[in-house]
Amino acid sequence: MKDPEIQEKGSVQKALMDKKESAYKKYVSLFVGKKGIWQFFKYECIILLFSWIPGAIGLFLRKIFYPFLFRNVGRGVVFGHHITLRHPHKITIGDNSFIDDYVVLDAKGEEDRGLFIGDNVIVGRNTIISCKGGSIHLDDFVNISANCSLLSESLI
């Protein structure tokens, strides 16, 4: 087995193994994306308070509070429960889109391109959409079935 210091590592592994960074800074870098205590506090409070609530009350509360995390959210967007968000400030969601339960929206990466979800898009339950340095653009009226994975290191 290769020495971990010599072995090539991806950006996530480099961030996690960096002994110079605190656990807080690693977490902010991997999940929140934007630096600063206000961004961290806002992200943590909204996720902690509203991500797990089922039913109509949860849908209503997420509709009000989740848009504060994103780059832009259109009208009539529905957020299911237990959605995982990474770097939500790089995510744009168009009008009348539906993000089902247990979806992962990951716009992590060095560049600021991120994830664009158009109008009237449905993202099915347990789907992972991940931009690892690339970007993903889902045009209007796209329907992604349940349990799918879309991963990009360039452009989809």
Feature locations, PLM:
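Terminal amphipathic alpha-helical/low-complexity segments used for targeting or macromolecular assembly
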Residues: 1-75, 141
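Short, functionally important structural connectors and interaction interfaces within domains
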Residues: 65, 75-77, 85, 148
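Flexible, glycine/small-residue-enriched loop-and-beta-strand segment within the central core
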Residues: 84-93, 98-156
